[in-house]
């Protein structure tokens, strides 16, 4: 089912801390339900969003591009028109001010190792759910002698309860 292109996203939210860079581009790493939901929600709020994960998610990503976005159903009704869905981690990380890692904690080390070579000074990494993932990321970055100045943060719990009901469609269980 192709999504209507008549709904345009709102202007990007102004996320700014004194003297900090405005966040406009977000990369979501995680091709599961929470990654899809987060990418769609951020895109619906007006952010430029890239969704990224491994090759096993390539089919889902092709469907997102074919549909023109990710459909949110349930307690949130919107179409998240993400810019790119890719398996290319280097492309996904490049230029993102925020990298939101929405994967299960057993994958934290894998993701830290994959993104480390491509990180840039000033990027922010948000790990969701955290489960002390910031410690894993820091340990991996130290082992790899990664010298880029990035900010590591984490959030306990997922952004919202959700279920991937079909490719390019997520049902959200609570209002945001």
Predicted regions and their residues:
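NAD(P)+-binding Rossmann beta1-loop-alpha1 motif at the extreme N-terminus of oxidoreductases
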Residues: 15-73, 93
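Rossmann-like NAD(P)(H) cofactor-binding subdomain of soluble oxidoreductases
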Residues: 105-168
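Conserved anion/nucleotide-ligand pocket segment
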Residues: 169-176
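A general structural motif
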Residues: 23, 46, 96, 121-122, ...
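Acidic, Ala/Val/Gly-enriched low-complexity intrinsically disordered segments
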Residues: 2, 10-11
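Rossmann-like NAD(P)-binding element
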Residues: 77-119, 123-126
């Amino acid at each position: 089912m192709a999504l209507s292109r008549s709904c345009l996203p709102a202007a990007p939210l102004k996320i700014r801390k004194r003297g900090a860079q405005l966040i406009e581009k977000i990369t979501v790493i995680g091709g599961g339900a929470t990654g899809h939901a987060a990418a769609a929600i951020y895109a619906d709020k007006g952010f430029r969003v890239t969704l990224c994960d491994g090759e096993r998610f390539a089919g889902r990503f092709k469907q997102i591009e074919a549909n023109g976005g990710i459909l949110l159903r349930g307690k949130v009704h919107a179409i998240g028109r993400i810019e790119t869905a890719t398996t290319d981690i280097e492309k996904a990380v490049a230029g993102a001010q925020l990298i939101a890692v929405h994967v299960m904690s057993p994958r934290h080390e894998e993701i830290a190792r994959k993104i480390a070579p491509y990180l840039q000074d000033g990027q922010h990494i948000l790990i969701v759910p955290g489960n002390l993932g910031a410690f894993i990321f820091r340990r991996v970055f130290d082992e790899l002698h990664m010298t880029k100045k990035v900010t590591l943060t984490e959030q306990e719990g997922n952004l919202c309860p959700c279920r991937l009901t079909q490719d390019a469609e997520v049902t959200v269980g609570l209002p945001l």
